[in-house]
Amino acid sequence: MRIITHDDGRCLTLRLLGELDHAAAQEAMPCIEDAVEEYLPRRCVLDLSGLSFMDSSGIAVILKTDRLLRQTGGALALCGVPRQVRRVLDVAGLTN
């Protein structure tokens, strides 16, 4: 799992690459927390287009990131959601 960070001054984009399973989620959250603390974004996008796999641990990462951003006055959006990841989100009831 890798995370590529890009901040354009208006939006922080975090691109997740690889597999987001239990072990990767434990590594990802501190990186995400550090980025949010450093940039204090009003808007953050999790770009999931680089994920090849995600399980329920990935859902926890998304929900924790959303909670963290709300606490700092920011908002979270997802983009580039692969089909397999979309299915996980659908099963969890997190899509429209």
Where are these predicted regions, by residue range?
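Short beta-strand/loop segment at the start of cytosolic alpha/beta domains
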Residues: 1-15
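Amphipathic alpha-helical interaction surfaces in cytosolic regulatory modules
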Residues: 19-96
